[in-house]
A protein has these predicted regions:
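N-terminal (or domain-start) structured segment
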Residues: 25-120
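N-terminal signal peptide c-region/cleavage motif recognized by signal peptidases
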Residues: 20-22
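A short glycine-rich beta-alpha junction/loop motif
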Residues: 122-125
Length: 125
């Protein structure tokens, strides 16, 4: 049986629209404030970059993006707070390679695994 190309294209377009229906049923993201956890004290370069990006994202998303500085232990305190947070996209670590790559070699007994506790979202520089 031969199906004309026009019918095939209409069938594929209809299937694509049906596949997109579940996405429309989801809640709009974000529906509450987003928190950038900076694992360093306020005033440093990582904090400054986080605040600039938070200001722009607040304008773009129409939802607050809050910077929460949790400095100490070379970034481990803030990184641990993010690792323990609910993985729902509302708590994001705005950090450097220290808490993720270097500290794992320097500190014993870390409560998080930098290889499995985080998902990269973007690079900022």
């Amino acid at each position: 049986m031969h199906m004309p190309k026009r019918h095939l294209l209409c069938l594929l377009a209809g299937a694509a629209m049906l596949a997109a229906l579940p996405a429309r049923a989801q809640d709009k993201f974000p529906d509450r404030p987003i928190m950038f956890v900076v694992p360093f004290p306020p005033g440093g370069p990582t904090d400054a970059m986080a605040r600039i990006l938070a200001t722009e994202l607040t304008k773009e998303l129409g939802q607050s993006v809050v910077v929460d500085n949790r400095g100490g232990a070379g970034g481990n305190i803030g990184a641990d707070a993010v690792a323990r947070a609910t993985p729902d996209g509302y708590t994001i670590m705005f950090g450097t390679s220290g808490p993720l790559a270097i500290n794992h070699s320097l500190y014993k007994g870390m409560k998080y695994d930098p290889r499995t506790s985080f998902e990269p979202v973007m690079y900022v520089g």
